[in-house]
Amino acid sequence: MASGVAVSDGVIKVFNDMKVRKSSTPEEVKKRKKAVLFCLSEDKKNIILEEGKEILVGDVGQTVDDPYTTFVKMLPDKDCRYALYDATYETKESKKEDLVFIFWAPESAPLKSKMIYASSKDAIKKKLTGIKHELQANCYEEVKDRCTLAEKLGGSAVISLEGKPL
């Protein structure tokens, strides 16, 4: 932990809940998180779950039409964040679901914030074991096009993301 920032237990619990796809009742599935944002605590000592910045599986098709577009809109204009996004995508062979770790560091974020988030990234990644895909973005142009995420998930083999053809 180069920055000395700790990862809160809440972050690890959310990650484990998103990672493990146990057989659940339809009600439990609706409560699963599709996307979450993590931020630094006020004192900059802990990485915590950002309150109210999440999409639940049950929201998709109800209050959320396109989870990826909604997720991109949750990212702040002028500050950094870490995020977990549970991507549902299709290749020519099969349907897949994978967690993607996203490091959001917009160019308009304060330099100090970018430095703390960049130096704390390894700390959070070490705690979130088993993530296959990572995306780092510095502006909305890099995330608003779902092809950027599809490229990370499997390149040209990916034919749709969140049910939307590429």
Swiss-Prot record:
Location of this chain's protein in the cell: Nucleus matrix; Cytoplasm, Cytoskeleton; Cell projection, Ruffle membrane; Cell projection, Lamellipodium membrane
Transmembrane parts of this sequence: none
Extent of motif Nuclear localization signal: 30-34
Main location: nucleus
Pfam families: Cofilin_ADF
Cross-link Glycyl lysine isopeptide (Lys-Gly) (interchain with G-Cter in SUMO2) placement: 132
Chain ranges of the ADF-H domain: 4-153
PTM comment text: Inactivated by phosphorylation on Ser-3. Phosphorylated on Ser-3 in resting cells. Dephosphorylated by PDXP/chronophin; this restores its activity in promoting actin filament depolymerization. The phosphorylation of Ser-24 may prevent recognition of the nuclear localization signal. Phosphorylated via a ARRB1-RAC1-LIMK1-PAK1 cascade upon active ligand stimulation of atypical chemokine receptor ACKR2.
GO cellular component: actin cytoskeleton; cell leading edge; cell-cell junction; cofilin-actin rod; cortical actin cytoskeleton; cytoplasm; dendritic spine; filopodium
General function of this protein: Binds to F-actin and exhibits pH-sensitive F-actin depolymerizing activity. Important for normal progress through mitosis and normal cytokinesis. In conjunction with the subcortical maternal complex (SCMC), plays an essential role for zygotes to progress beyond the first embryonic cell divisions via regulation of actin dynamics. Required for the centralization of the mitotic spindle and symmetric division of zygotes. Plays a role in the regulation of cell morphology and cytoskeletal organization in epithelial cells.
Record PANTHER family: COFILIN-RELATED
Protein name: Cofilin-1
Protein's organism: Rattus norvegicus
Gene from which this protein is expressed: Cfl1
